[in-house]
Amino acid sequence: MLRKNLKFPQRVLAALGLSALLASSAFATPKVVIISLDGATPRLIKAYEDAHQIPTGTGFEILKDKGTLALQNITVTPSLTAVAHIALATGSNPSPNDINTNTFQLVASPFTKTISGFGAPIGGYVFNPLGEDPNPTARPLWHALKAAGKTVVTATWAGGDGVDVKVPGLDNSPIIQPAALRTVDFTVPFGEFGGLSAQGFALTKADFTPLPTPKLRGQLIAAGHPSYSEILQKRTPLQTFKVGGVSYTIQVVAIDSTDDGVTNYDTLVFYDVAQGVQPGPFQLPSTGPAYVKFSSGMSAPFYLEGSSNKAGLGYFVSALSSDLSTVHIVQYAADDIPRNPAVIADVDDINTHVGFWADQADFRIPERISPGLSQFSDQELEAAFEDQVRLFVDYQTRVALRAMERFPDADLLMIYIEQPDGSEHQFLLTDQRQATNPTDPNSIYTSQDPAKIARYQGYTLNAYLTANRAVDNIIKAVGLDENGVPKADVFVVSDHGFDPFFTSVSGANILAKGGFDTSKVRAVTSGPDVNFYINLQGREPNGTVTPQEYITLQQQIVQYVQSLNDTNPLFTLGQQTVPVFEIVHPRPVDINDPNFGLETDSFIGQDAGDVVAVLTDGYNFDGVQSPLVNRKGDPQDSKAILSVSNFYGAHGFNSQILDMSAIFYAAGPDILHGTLDLVHNIDVAPTIDKILGVQPDDTVQGTVINGLLK
């Protein structure tokens, strides 16, 4: 993101930065590299390969041609991102590793609090007395590797964050999992919201006026950005906000970068009034002003100088008339890398060598959840989303290559790439029951919008091509031998597959329709999965439900959710009824057990709900609109359980469904060439241990993949 020479556009510098990292990291080779492509789905990759849309000699094609491909990789249930990544890292299922959804409640926390599955204690904790478990029921594979003297690097992998985990909402909570268990030799946490949400600005020429003083013109010339028409400045500041303890006043000016004798404004310049337009060069994470040339179709980064969290954002211009009659600007959300004390040196290394945390694809923009976007066309907002797809995967790739540069001979490098998941959620519009206009329930079947479907198919393809480029760049950094085989053992996996969904399900309305008291029962949802928690005395702080009432409530929840059926023939495809839930699993209970309410089994972990339920494929708790939009053919009901969704793709369903299969590729010195019919994602960790000659942790449930290793 550094503009080392301000005459170079940002996209060129990003490419140069990536090339430099590729060159510098190619001289040494890690032993094992695992790359997780969130949401990559075997059937979609095969379709793109069959259509010759994946470039030969790159990424997926190298791995398939020189190594092993599995036709099916059964992940865990629920097939959610945090759940599956912790399963990959531990080689254990969600019950023992205690991460059962992306968001859930620690039973030690107050009844209204939740924790992210990405930051929850792996393998559980001691409930009474509350504290760290010296013998957790699952450990990440880096625990055994580091004990054996191996070098491990995690680049935004779930669980590798250097966090001291505490119980949310509990005053004076002890550390229930120390940072040491979540820290490796080089640990890069996944980024976080920096304090300013995305928003749009729709301006016209009336919003601009000539510069009041010539000072800024001189600054722009000094910075290498002269204007060949009169510089126009917004009459009032574009925005003011506070991030990381610092207040910012952002102004925007329009310049004409073409020396053609015609007034045609083509570039917007964003700067902080307190900083002015500085000429540079800038040292990362600093960027100076953001210069956005509309014709590039790309955003520009903007570092928030002085912010305590080292945050930054971006500006994207989605529409710009040469006479400024239409000016549409999308300000991306501010983001940063968490400054966790245990890994602060690694965080600063990324900030100063790669840049501040880039903007990942933000669904709030195309769904118009972010303010100020009502005048923007769908295509404008989709263009902003696609820009973020490119931007963020490029950033994650450079983070991975920087990690490789720091530890070129690491024994294990674990890399996470967010695409194609984000795009599939937004654009997997492939089912005739999906409303192409979320506000119009009639836009299904023959009333779907074919142009929108075609655009969305292109965006999904682009996500896979972008992910493939990331894989290819990392493989090329590892290096290929004379036979074209990667010099390291490279695993490319995903956490889950993907399917379209056509109906949103309201957890809140399930409780209301079922007559449940929300002070006693709550529903914590993640995708198509829900944990129903009961506010049990002696378990939750200030719990109110007696053990006897708990048993009654648990039975009522099970009976009610099992009774929910979809009877609308437009959505049941010829069946009279379709159960809304495929899996409904209660926590085992024994009224005489001193650990009543903490019992576990092969599906229910310590912090899972008292009833865990998984929706039938095609239904999803996410996507409920406000106000709710009733489906075509359903009764008009503002509190309906089933409704029209505002996006299209989902995962988290039963992992035995073929479409939920993750991908699995492997190639390298220790990998055979061939095809495997079936692998399991919990087998990846012990297979890596085998390659590195380390005995797996005794909590590992997976086994070495048969037929993979030489």
Where are these regions (language model features)?
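Bacterial N-terminal signal peptides
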Residues: 13-23
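Active-site nucleophile/metal-coordination loop of metallo-enzymes that catalyze phosphate/sulfate
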Residues: 42-147, 158-181, 251, 258-260, ...
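Metal-dependent active-site segment of extracytoplasmic phospho-/sulfohydrolases and closely related
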Residues: 59, 463-509, 572-588, 592-594, ...
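A contiguous, mid-domain pocket- or channel-lining segment that forms the substrate-recognition surface
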Residues: 127-379, 392, 396-414, 418-438
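Active-site neighborhoods of enzymes that stabilize oxyanions during catalysis
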Residues: 137-139, 202, 207-326, 333-334, ...
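Acidic/histidine-rich catalytic neighborhood
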Residues: 472, 485-544, 551
